[in-house]
Amino acid sequence: MTKQRILFITTGGTIASVHTPQGLRPVLSSDELLAHLPELNDLCIPETLALCSIDSTDLGQEHWLMMARAIQENYALYDGFIICHGTDTLAYSAAALSYLIQNADKPIILTGAQQPLSNEITDAKKNLRDSVICALDPGSRGVMVVFGGHVIAGTRAKKNKTISYDAFASVNFPELALVQGDRLVRYVPSPWPTGPVEFGRAMNPRVFLLKLIPGMDPGMIPEIFRLYDCVIVESFGVGGIPQRLMDAFAEGLGHYEQTHKVLILTTQVTYEGSDVGVYEVGKRVKNRFRFLEAHDMTIEAVVTKSMWLLAQNCDSFDQLQQRFYRQVNFDTFYH
């Protein structure tokens, strides 16, 4: 049987780092990464593309667009893509690529490591090998995260451990599969494309994430609305916002009503999502504002979906709302 061609796209991160007097620094080239795993040649035809070599905390919208463009330019040449990425912002990149690359009929996998590949004891080799096993499975399609043996939809991944090897969890949705040795045990089928693969070319970075704290001074809220096109509010519980903060939100939205500013409400709680209408404090919000509610979506998905949608120049709030709730790569089950 003909071996499949897999393109490894490297971006830096812990997996490509070595110890220096200044701390871990990503310096390994893409070819040096694969040199640590010669056994991959028995599974596939691995080739490499070095996109950048930076700490993932320095990654942003321009890098997500670079990743999408690199996959677009090589899409016809390879059977699958594995992006080696730092763990700190990997979930953001996975969500962003889920929106920037839709209807993919090939696997696009993000992985990384908690310990550098150059270490004697590391999770990097397992994660890279597991990613190849997942990529070679004929049922693998679209953007996903492979880490610690777990396969997670790109819009549902969240880093919830800073040191442990099982660093990522699937939030409010089952894991897609598990990698057990050379076998992929699938729980959820990958979504079938509804048309030809589509690549996005723009994201609007003017999105602000505001985490509420008890007793927060509302004075900065109108200024936030002045500077940003979309404000995502991490409310308390299922969707509570203090009364004095609501007054500030009303001022901010009212002042910029004609400029299509967007307010999105979500929750600080990782699991089970928001439901603004449950309590009186939430119902006050519903009666006073025009907003989108994130419901079961992860913060990473809400942030990147907002950036993607705002770059599409929706004609009205209703159109934006319709697109926001359209499911992409299992990101939401609210209709």
Where in this protein do the model-derived segments appear?
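ATP/NTP phosphate-donor binding region
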Residues: 1-73, 271
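Accessory alpha-helical/coil subdomains and C-terminal extensions
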Residues: 2-5, 9-17, 29-40, 153-238, ...
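Short acidic, glycine/serine/threonine-rich loops at helix termini
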Residues: 19-22, 94-95, 120-123, 153-159, ...
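Short acidic, glycine-rich surface-loop motifs adjacent to enzyme active sites
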Residues: 78-90, 227-239
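Short Gly/Thr/Asp-enriched flexible loops that form oxyanion-binding sites at enzyme active sites
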Residues: 84-106, 243-251
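Short, acidic/small-residue loops that bind anionic groups at enzyme active sites
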Residues: 94-123, 132-138, 255-267
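Internal gly/pro-rich beta-alpha loop/helix module
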Residues: 110-180
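C-terminal non-catalytic interaction/assembly regions of soluble proteins
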Residues: 238-335
